[in-house]
Amino acid sequence: MRKIVHLSDVHFGTADPAVTELVVSKINEISPDVVVVSGDLTQRAKSIEFKQARAFLDRLPKPQIVVPGNHDVPLYNVFDRFLRKLDKFEKYITDDLTPTFIDEEIAIVGVNTARSLTIKGGRISEEQTHYIQSQLRNLSDDMLKVVVTHHPFDLPDGHDEDDVVGHAERAIHMIADCGGDVFLAGHLHVSNIETTANRYKLPNGRVALIIQAGTATSARVRGEPHSFNLIQFDNPWLRIERLECRSVADGFRPA
């Protein structure tokens, strides 16, 4: 059985130190094959926050697939926002904005959906979608094929439609056409699992999973406890479990 830990929106700068320690401990206990972080490593894209995020990642198992979120782009420094939007992310976290992991059973491809022209929105470009296709197209149908973005392809009830990643319709059809099985994201600080059938009509009746992680460590929770996802793959079975922390004393337990 293969294990993927999916966490998001750790937001160093507002991260709860006690919960952060619990996350590190639990993920190391799980000993996953891959750790996925779907963006918003910082609160305000400050160097000190990126340094804290780097130290956090260094304590987690490898390999890791890490993509930026909108909070990892400077907000108030307009010069940096437009001309050096991901310089600090690339310096402290990774300079690979299309992180990819492929072995004999799992393929995971991440892309950056954060943009300078929006405060919180994001989009996936045609070029990025073609890159994902190039990585997934010729892989075995028996493999689990995962795409990672910060902005989600679908939403829980009651959320702003603007939070759906831009160009989602085009991208999800192109990716599904080459076998995309699972779409991982964050952004809303709310856990959610949907199938693509909720929003999209894919060709040949194909259905994929859209999975969002809540915030793992940020003090700014939105109606649910700190959490992250554990994805277990034993072909053809896929199990998704949310681990949540209702109190520091309880630690992270299955929801």
Residue ranges and their predicted role:
Residues G13-D16, Q43-I48, N70-R81, S116-K120, ...:
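Active-site environment of divalent metal-dependent phosphoester hydrolases
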Residues L7-S8, V35-D40, Q64-N70, N112, ...:
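Active-site neighborhood of phospho(di)ester-bond hydrolases with catalytic His/Asp-centered motifs
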Residues K51-Y131, L139, H173-A176, P203, ...:
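Extended active-site neighborhood of metal-dependent phosphoesterases/phosphodiesterases
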Residues Q232-A255:
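A short C-terminal boundary segment appended to hydrolase-like catalytic domains
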Residues M1, P32, P61, S140-L144, ...:
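A general structural motif
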Residues M1-R59, L75-Y76, Y131:
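N-terminal active-site segment of His-dependent metallophosphoesterases
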Residues D160-P236:
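Conserved beta-sheet core of the metallophosphoesterase superfamily
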Residues D141-P156:
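Short acidic, glycine-rich surface-loop motifs adjacent to enzyme active sites
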